[in-house]
């Protein structure tokens, strides 16, 4: 093994490169991966100059730090992800402008009316941010900045600040998604597509630039217009993997109670919330369940006590036990695994330990990132492996974190769901993961079909 000193702008980083290693199954494809992807797979800083190193060097280094499986999955998935650059979701823009955006337009009108009433001004003034600021000043409320961050931080200082923030949020959404009008074809259709990055973060998530396909508004889904498929009416089919992070953690930790709950179709968030609030499960409301779900995922993604306290305070609900204590009581094996991520001396990726310290170049990771990355990366790797399993059977047009959006015939919905369900089972087995697969996929037809 040869130690090579690689220089970044910030520091010298010692990287062990097995320069005399033999070519393995990743070597023949690693050269096709973009350099930023290789750097992220190697947990190297973005400004690291890796252009002078060979594919063999990259392969050996990434294998040596325990990221060989991630590299192999990425080499298989990268061309499939890049195929998404040539796929699109068809939007009926007229329907979107008249029906889809209507809830936003109605909400904006309501906010403007409240601003009028609160400040005693006309509709013209209520539409103008500067006028709102001036009239608020006359009533003793100073708003020195229209910056979103300032408004968010001070939204509870005065009702008019919260109303102004709501107005600006709605203005931004309406403006952003109205711009699609210029992309209509003669049939009033807009093709929604993005430029995909197969490894956009250190967790391995793949995302679309230009148009953020993962951020398409839910209100838009009723306005999609699927083309015909093999002469039959087509549909866009959403297949969402329910609670994939919790499932992967339950499998990795062999969390007995949690595995049983998934197997039996128990509503885990309602179960947790009932014990958090000290009420029967049947009495848990949707709002209360939402609090429980927010706390579970905030904790699993690395939130500390102060963040959890803020979520609870904002809800105005009374809890009888701290969320972290309750999770430890209910799911001790899962919490033990999460603690190993947070407290370990090495970085975990896809729920398994690597051979590297938890840092990117000279910058050490915060505890929350050490806890978050193993879960996020496991989901990303599994979704990529599923794509390789189903690529020749299913036409995927978009991927949103743990959700596949596919184009298929209207009478193929059950068949496509079964194929993707089997894809998860096969992918889990290939990666050596454990995933409770009962009630895994939720199928939804998006919009209508031609």
Label each PLM-derived region with a short phrase.
Residues 430-450:
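Short proline/glycine- and acidic-rich turn/helix-capping motifs at secondary-structure junctions
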Residues 3-16, 24-125, 253-263, 333:
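Mixed-charge, glycine-rich, non-catalytic linkers/tails in nucleic-acid processing enzymes
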Residues 105, 407-415, 448-450:
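Short glycine/threonine-rich loop-to-helix capping motif typified by GTGT followed
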Residues 291-301:
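Short, amphipathic alpha-helical "recognition" segments used to contact nucleic acids or chromatin
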Residues 306-308, 402-407:
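Short cationic amphipathic helices and targeting signals
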Residues 390-395, 429-435:
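Short secondary-structure junctions
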Residues 2, 11-15, 19-20, 24-25, ...:
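Acidic, glycine-rich two-metal-ion catalytic cores of nucleic acid-processing enzymes
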Residues 69-160, 301-338:
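Extended, well-ordered alpha-helical scaffold/bundle regions in very large, multi-domain proteins
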